[in-house]
Amino acid sequence: MSIHTSFLPVGGWELTVILFIGWVLDLCLGDPTYIPHPVIYMGRWIAFGEKKLNKGTHRMFKGALFAIASIIGTFVLIWSILSYFTLRSSLFTCAVSAFLVFMCLAGHTLRKEVRMVFEALERGLDDGRRQVARIVGRDTQNLSAQEVRTAALETLAENLSDGVIAPLFWFCLLGVPGMMAYKMANTLDSMIGYQNERYKDFGCWAARIDDIANYIPARITALLILIASIFFPAHSSKTTAQPSSATQPLSGSTLPFHRKIAFLLRYGNKHASPNSGWPEAALAAVLNCRFGGTHDYFGQEFYKPYIGDTPRQLNYNDMRISNIICFIAELFAILISLIIFFSV
């Protein structure tokens, strides 16, 4: 297989090695601040385009063209770069591809950031609010400690899909160019895909494209979370362990597996997003807790339907369980992807 055709749904030892190296780099290094991240440049491009185009009339049309052109342009750019390098050195192309996979995966940093939120809460509520503001889009200045923990775990579940499973899904379908194109789509949604006065027209297509790109990965993520939860014994959902209970034994939900599936099917589509509710419902089923409620975004109040019926206090062990389960789910996804490439 020629590596420059790796945007096609084909496999081989090259893609197996590329994916494994990229994943190991993320596992060990996370997102090092000393390496410029491609998403930074995507963000600058989006900010530039939004400033130039999001004014006057026909904002929805201009936003649609901008989103589609940005995504296709990213795919073509990465494919062209890899094709150019392949003509000179397949080994160098593999190295560049592995680096881009590394940049597209965010599992290590996601788990680290969520853990830091819970650790910050031990120092004080204001510290927790500031820390969670790094990973959520909602206004955090008035959140309670319980709302800070809930926001962190909701983000963990949602971004396991956006930051790990979905990039892997598009890598399996369209190789490194597809993975990078997905990151552009996801970055567009995170920057302009809001239903407020400024973005509701210009960012409409960006939000819909992201919904389509994440439709299957979000449901795969939910299933992987539930499968990963099998490794944890049951515990009482009435636990009152304090946030600092890092030495408490780890345990899972009181719900048997078939009840978790029923929980997922009941609450997966309750979210305002067609996708975010599925991984969130899966994690809520594992923890036997409740997500959702009223949140403020850019000073405007939004209501998210509740996911779950058990409004118990979340604690430090819930974070530990969630991080481990999300890592196991990520590991399953990596193994499945490697098997696909190695066997084709």
Predicted regions and their residues:
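Hydrophobic alpha-helical transmembrane segments
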Residues: 2-180, 185, 193-344
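RNA/tRNA-interacting regions in translation and RNA-turnover enzymes
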Residues: 190
